[in-house]
């Protein structure tokens, strides 16, 4: 079958069946394409979309060191850790880390997330119950918030006076897909792809799907043009390339924010970076004008610029 005759989904339905939960259906697709797309989108949404979350918690300035310690509230230490960990948070574009603080004293009361003191650039997007404070003794809860991509397991349970947490950065909290039979005319050997997506509210489901599709598209862009692949891309010896282009982007000494943005889109070498346009970089998650300006300035110091075509760039580095 000619590539141009492959079916593309023409019947697309969007069903927002609950808050921050949407089911998407796409039909009709060639047999097998539904599974291929569904699996790729699911994995990308769960593990490759950037976000922010609580990564560690300190109680009473680190004096509480065990889940068995007694604190002045109805909940256990473990309960409070789980409640604080469940907070949906966002960090401003130019902020990499933040702090959430609860300082409790006086009479007993129920404490919710809206009573927290937040560092600059940090926001809590949904109200969450934290604890039932019993009054009397003071109670201080500090939570560290970081940006990241995918999942990062805690290397220890408790370190440096803090309870360390497994970090799930993706704003997509659930994604699954199902393949059903579809029909077009007399053809009954087709796929219908149904995607079920739930987010924490920091990104809506449609935006999460778009981000995932864009990431997959960027990964595949070098093999989209079949004619170029058939011709074969033969490159010159790397020694003929400016050695600066073969250095890792870490040698530019960028800020953590800019470095993380480049890692998120798999830009490892300076040569890969200079071949990107400004618009391409601005489409990367959490990549803003400050990062763009910083990168342009660093490249300029080396006599380089964005949007540079490198004809003999090795594709297998």
Swiss-Prot record:
It catalyses: RNA(n) + a ribonucleoside 5'-triphosphate = RNA(n+1) + diphosphate. The keyword Transmembrane does not apply. One of its GO terms (molecular function) is protein dimerization activity. It comes from the Bacteria. GO terms for cellular component: cytoplasm; DNA-directed RNA polymerase complex. The keyword NADP does not apply. GO terms for biological process: DNA-templated transcription. Keywords: DNA-directed RNA polymerase, Nucleotidyltransferase, Transcription, Transferase. Its EC number is 2.7.7.6. Residues 241-317 are annotated as: Alpha C-terminal domain (alpha-CTD). Residues 1-227 are annotated as: Alpha N-terminal domain (alpha-NTD). Homodimer. The RNAP catalytic core consists of 2 alpha, 1 beta, 1 beta' and 1 omega subunit. When a sigma factor is associated with the core the holoenzyme is formed, which can initiate transcription. Belongs to the RNA polymerase alpha chain family. The N-terminal domain is essential for RNAP assembly and basal transcription, whereas the C-terminal domain is involved in interaction with transcriptional regulators and with upstream promoter elements. DNA-dependent RNA polymerase catalyzes the transcription of DNA into RNA using the four ribonucleoside triphosphates as substrates. This is DNA-directed RNA polymerase subunit alpha 2.
